[in-house]
Amino acid sequence: DKTNTAALELAQLGQAIDHMAENLEKQEDVRRQLTSDVAHELRTPVANVSSQLEAMIEEVWEPTKERLQSCYDELGRISGIISDLEKLRQIEASNMVLEKEPVDLLELAQAVKTAFEPELAKKKLTCMVTGESAIISGDQRRLHQVIFNLVSNAVKYSTESGQILIDIHNSGKNVQLTVKDQGIGIAKEDIPLIFERFYRTDRSRNRKTGGAGIGLTIVKAIVLAHGGNISVESVKGCGSCFMVVLPKK
């Protein structure tokens, strides 16, 4: 009867309100955690620059080239953190709206390699792009970001004179992208966590490279938005291999 129907509707409404409240609470927890993480990431470089500049202004230290370079490096680190956060904000705010078009991943990989040539030369690294033309329907700008971030990680954590391999090949209805390096590798216990926001396997190593541990979070979000998946194989001290599989359509 109408009474039972009304009671059922009220119960369903109550459940919906409880569910909404639970989601809002989770979002608030995420927001608080994000604010805390950002503050933590920025606090150290800001404090370093501030203390060094203060010491030079008060003539406690001479403004040597090395100290000025240190300040410059810390400012670069801050800039890298802000840049990564802005990219992640754009991705999350837009719910990843993709502007799809035919994209050749081999061409993108070659373009990324060219962009990294100065850094490769500086570290005496060899970078090879192998494979075949592989065209998918995807967002070119976002897919460029995927390859760029993976190669950036490989460059950052490779030792001098190492080799980086970018391989693209067709695999049935999919395309597989592999970025392999001979760098410092990732410990087994850290592998399941590396795609989490702000997670870094070794915080000290990022002092020179900048960034906030968001690059792989961005990569995973873009790959998933394209209906693909990403995995990694790594041995501490022996390098890493990131594998991305994307559907062609």
Where are the predicted features?
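Membrane-proximal HAMP signal-relay module
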Residues: 1-35, 53-58, 90, 106, ...
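Short conserved segment of the HATPase_c
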Residues: 186-200
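Short beta-strand/loop element within the Bergerat-fold HATPase_c
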Residues: 161-173
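Short alpha-helical segment of the dimerization/phosphotransfer core of two-component systems
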Residues: 73-81
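Conserved micro-motifs of the catalytic ATP-binding
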Residues: 93-98, 131, 135-138
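Short helix-loop "hinge" at the ATP-lid/N-box region of the Bergerat-fold HATPase_c
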Residues: 154-155
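Short conserved segments within the C-terminal catalytic ATPase subdomain
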Residues: 119-129
